[in-house]
Swiss-Prot record:
Disulfide bonds: none annotated. NCBIfam families: pheS (TIGR00468). The keyword Ribonucleoprotein does not apply. Belongs to the class-II aminoacyl-tRNA synthetase family. Phe-tRNA synthetase alpha subunit type 1 subfamily. It is found in: Cytoplasm. It holds the Pfam family tRNA-synt_2d. This is Phenylalanine--tRNA ligase alpha subunit. Tetramer of two alpha and two beta subunits.
Amino acid sequence: MENTIRSLQQEIIDFEITTAADLEAFRLRYTVRKGLIAALFGQLKTVEPAEKPRMGQLLNQLKQTADAKLTEAEERLAGTESKSSSNRIDLTLPGRRYFTGSEHPVQKVLGEMKSIFSAMGFGIATGPELETDQYNFDLLNFPPDHPARDMQDTFFVTSGNPGSDVLLRTHTSPVQIRVMLDQKPPIRVICPGKVYRNEAISSRSYCVFHQLEGLYIDKKVSFADLKATIYSFAKQMFGTDVKLRFRPSFFPFTEPSAEVDVTCYLCGGKGCKVCKKSGWLEIMGCGMVHPNVMRNCGIDPEEWSGYAFGMGVDRTVLLRYKIDDIRLLFENDLRMLKQFTA
């Protein structure tokens, strides 16, 4: 029996417990009431009386060895389980919503505008946002002392000789000048981009905004062609039931000139603070390209004619989505921008 006890003790010492399954197997084999150790205790009655005390002592040592190993393994595995649990994802917790980004409403509407005019045959031209006085004013029929310059409050960057002042462009019309200087007619382009004006910030105006201008030069182009283009654009942009009105206006670079209005989207024409109680909102200016502008770009106005138009993209965004404050488009308020997430 002594050999059996010593062999079993060595077996217990060598038993590797690394998992909960190993622990349970050890317990069932050695320490339960029907385990190997309990079975040996049951065999003590068959041992010679003189050997019983010594065999009993060996069995007690065997049981202590097994119990100690079992306790140590339980504590070790419990610590490992606790550490593992602290890093484990609790699947019962409510999920966290991750918001995906989306296209800004200004860029979305600008993309639609580009698509509409591209379908009409217009190309796309861009130019620098930092311009000279010559491109921004002089070549567009704004003489240095002409009062029309007061219509566009300008951010000047540097000031030098007349015509060479560097400024932030007040419209994308300088891009049209560059196109007319670089290309020969016929010309059909749109010019999207950011523009800057030193204006008071309000619900209807901002110091920086997005503009899209168009230019078409060919032979025998008329004001009727201009109206047809604008009506076609408006119906695709605002819906087939859109109402427009043309008002006579003045721009140094077009003659005749007009402004185009649509019915106020908030009040339906009844009058509100957004439309200044008029019931109408201006969406663009337009007109026939002034002969002086053509001459400045080396184009003969006796042979060629054309029209131009320009609109605020941000104003169109307000119309499309019924937003009553243009400042919301520039403040990066996620509460507003998340509404445009697809």
